Amino acid sequence: MKCKLSDICSFRKGKISVDGLNRSTYISTENMLPNKCGITEASSLPTVQLTQEYKKGDVLVSNIRPYFKKIWKATYDGGCSNDVLVFAANSNTDKDFLYYILANDDFFAWCSMPIYCRKP
């Protein structure tokens, strides 16, 4: 059975105040570890007032250099940079299943292809 990614998840669009974050709850591409190894503590917080929100169970994927395979399933709520995509599972989708799909090497290979080579 084939389906579109939009059938199982959507991008989270909410914003969160940076004042409510700390270096443990802020995620950027810099503190996401390559090869699907999770995250480390951020070295600093952004200087803007609001940033992208994520919720526990969301899947965060670095939007920069996808061949590094930076991905993390959130274990708590927080905020992230705009260079991090936040995928929220739809109500009919298991959050672990969404992580499994997005952490698959085929997904990262597809993301690494030039846009004109991608099949819908």
Regions found by a protein language model. Give the residues of each.
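Non-catalytic DNA-recognition/assembly elements of restriction-modification systems
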Residues: 1-18, 32
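Short alpha-helix capping/helix-loop boundary micro-motifs
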Residues: 39-49, 70
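Extended, charge-rich, solvent-exposed interface segments
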Residues: 120
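A short beta-sheet element
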Residues: 50-52, 56-108, 116
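Short coil/turn segments at secondary-structure boundaries
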Residues: 18-26, 113-115
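Short, basic/aromatic beta-hairpin or loop at an interaction surface
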Residues: 26-40
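Residue-level detector of conserved, well-ordered beta-strand and adjacent loop positions
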Residues: 6, 28, 88
